[in-house]
């Protein structure tokens, strides 16, 4: 069986046509283990290349098999034509849902002329394809210190939703009015993962981390005045949190927080 898995891995990296996803591969391996098909028959049925070379991009067509989630398109700094080209390549590889982050309105309008795009301007998230059924173990809570943090929060929330998670939004519950957060204490205590998003001094993550019994993913934002240094003060505050179980992603990185929260919620 070890040899067969090695053969499968080698063929995955070599073959040129994509016809299988992770679930199908698992079913294939189970059929081999049960004797329903031979290793050779299974190997012959797998047609996957590791990437599709577009010249300006090498689309990772094998990522869902390795990581359980397909490649995400980072829209910022890409031309609208490049984004559309990558989308087309992914659809050719039978991707069911494509997530595009940091997508401008101009790029969204261009891509929407060619594909069925669901675009949210606040989060700059573009989604092509069907949203999956909710398959996470429990709920992910996304909380913000202020209304100004919502664009980053929506990037996190929509990312988590694309990967099949139920998301509860708690917006504008920062430390300037603790009673707002305490009014949702049951939601905090019953979450499986919490994403705490805040600018200014970034205190929200520590406060939530001191109450919750689940992992807290802290997201510093660039919201704030001069000494906020574009989110650096919030970042350092969150990194130095005294609360246990608080991890930190990069400034304004809602996508990273949503992705990590989804992984935790599927464990």
Where are these regions (language model features)?
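Short, acidic/small-residue loops that bind anionic groups at enzyme active sites
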Residues: 118-122, 208-232
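Glycine-rich phosphate/diphosphate-binding loop of Rossmann-like nucleotide-binding domains
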Residues: 137-177
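Glycine-rich phosphate-binding loop
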Residues: 183-221
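Short, Lys/Arg-enriched N-terminal segments with co-localized hydrophobic residues
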Residues: 1-19
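C-terminal binding/interaction regions
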Residues: 223, 227-267
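Short glycine/serine/threonine-rich phosphate/pyrophosphate-binding segments
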Residues: 83, 149-154, 178-179, 198-207, ...
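Long amphipathic alpha-helical segments
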Residues: 19-104, 109, 113-115
């Amino acid at each position: 069986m070890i040899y067969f898995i090695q053969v499968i891995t080698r063929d995955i990296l070599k073959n040129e046509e994509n016809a299988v996803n992770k679930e199908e591969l698992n079913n294939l391996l189970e059929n081999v283990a049960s004797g329903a098909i031979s290793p050779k028959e299974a190997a012959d049925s797998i047609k996957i290349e590791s990437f599709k070379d577009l010249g300006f991009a090498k689309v990772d067509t094998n990522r869902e098999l390795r990581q359980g989630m397909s490649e995400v398109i980072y829209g910022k700094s890409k031309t609208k034509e490049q984004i559309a080209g990558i989308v087309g390549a992914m659809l050719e590889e039978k991707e069911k849902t494509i997530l595009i982050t940091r997508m401008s309105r101009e790029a969204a309008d261009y891509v929407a002329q060619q594909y069925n795009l669901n675009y949210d301007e606040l989060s700059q998230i573009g989604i092509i394809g069907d949203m999956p059924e909710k398959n996470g173990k429990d709920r992910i809570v996304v909380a913000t210190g202020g209304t100004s943090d919502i664009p980053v929060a929506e990037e996190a929330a929509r990312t988590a939703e694309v990967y099949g998670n139920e998301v509860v939004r708690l917006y504008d519950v920062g430390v300037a009015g603790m009673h707002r957060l305490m009014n949702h204490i049951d939601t905090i205590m019953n979450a499986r993962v919490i994403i705490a998003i805040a600018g200014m001094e970034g205190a929200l993550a520590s406060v939530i981390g001191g109450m919750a019994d689940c992992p807290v993913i802290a997201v510093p934002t660039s919201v704030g005045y001069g000494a906020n240094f574009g989110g650096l003060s919030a970042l350092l505050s969150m990194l130095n949190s005294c609360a246990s179980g608080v991890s930190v992603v990069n400034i304004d990185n809602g996508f990273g927080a949503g992705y990590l929260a989804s992984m935790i919620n599927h464990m």
